[in-house]
Each structure stands twice: as structure tokens, then as C-alpha cells.
């Protein structure tokens, strides 16, 4: 399977997982060959989806940060036969945790 098809499949799989968690998320779109967001529907969060067996997480986070445009960059990733994981910068995790702890919506 080529990397574009595998990427699309990963994005669709993660969007489905998000919907199962109660969030109205769908796969993003590409326009004129330009990359858009991998998935949309999580306000304030920029999601980079990686569905690979070997992942350079620092490269993936750098890509998400580069494309985030003011949103919190995360990487949603998983291997075959494994659960979805979310990786994000520690400072962003603490920002979300403080908001949750204070009872605020992020």
C-alpha cells in the first residue's frame, strides 16, 4: 500500500475513533495538492495522524507544530494491532490540565 493511501486510512481510522469517543470529527481535506489538517472537529487542537510501525516522534511533533497555526499541536499515532496514543509537548499538556483542574473549557 502506498504511503498516501496508508495515511488516508490512518486519518479515517482516527476520525472514527474520535466519533466513538463522542466527538464529531472527520478527515480533513487536501486542496490543490496542499496539505490541510489530517482531521477536523477538535477546536483548538491540531492533529497530525501517523499510522506507522516506526515513528520518529520528534519529526512528527515538529510537523504538527509547523502546521498548527496557533492551535495545540498533537500527534495521534498507532501501530498495527495497538491502541491509539496521543503525543504532545509537556507545556501543552500542563496547559490543558490546568484548564481541566480549574473547571474551565479549553
Please provide the spans of the model-predicted regions.
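Catalytic phosphate/metal-binding cores of nucleic-acid and nucleotide-processing enzymes, i.e., regions
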Residues: 1-106
Amino acid at each position: 500500500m502506498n504511503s498516501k493511501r496508508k495515511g488516508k486510512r490512518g486519518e479515517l481510522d482516527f476520525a472514527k475513533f474520535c466519533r466513538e469517543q463522542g466527538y464529531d470529527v472527520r478527515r480533513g481535506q487536501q486542496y490543490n495538492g496542499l496539505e490541510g489538517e489530517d482531521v477536523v472537529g477538535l477546536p483548538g487542537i491540531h492533529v497530525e495522524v501517523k499510522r506507522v510501525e516506526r515513528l520518529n516522534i520528534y519529526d512528527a511533533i515538529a510537523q504538527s507544530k509547523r502546521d498548527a497555526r496557533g492551535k495545540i499541536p498533537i500527534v495521534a499515532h498507532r501501530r498495527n494491532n495497538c491502541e491509539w496514543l496521543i503525543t504532545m509537548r509537556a507545556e501543552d499538556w500542563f496547559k490543558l490540565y490546568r484548564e481541566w483542574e480549574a473547571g474551565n473549557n479549553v
